[in-house]
Amino acid sequence: IRDSTTSGFSIVTWTGTEAVGTVAHGLSTAPDLIIAKDTESGAAWRVGSDDIPTAWEYVMYLNQTPAATDENTAFNDTAPTASVFSLGSGQDINTSGNTIVAYCFNSIEGYSKVGSYVGNANNDGTFIYTGFAPAYIWIKNTDSAYDWYQTDNKRSPYNERNKTLYLNNSNAEETYSWVDLD
């Protein structure tokens, strides 16, 4: 485990067993977001979060576009605790003998924020309070099959931030009129 409770981030590796179990995450509170990958297979990255509909029962795939999907073999339909997260018996992120990696995130006031929002289809958009000016933002629709978008304050250093990259494909940077982050 490599962790920093100050920044709310840990990197955890383990050897898969295909048995229901738990993995220590090294943070002092339950992670808000976990991104896990079997490093020895072509299986998709699994993303679990309190903010995905039916939290920890449904996952999203970082390298794919589907909406949140019911998958009990990833996190065993169980929310993380202050010390561990759960694994199901499937091969997706628990393949017997394979090395698995997980990136665990906690929201830290004034530093990082994991959350969700409901769009309002207005020109002004939805106001999302983070308590600070984010340097990096990920966006993924959990209800529909859309890409994962990221934007940052280096590509778009001023208001409005509308230059995006995709996390799930190799498209070049694009500028969107519908992505106007202040």
Put a short name on every predicted segment.
Residues 1-182:
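Surface-exposed molecular-recognition determinants
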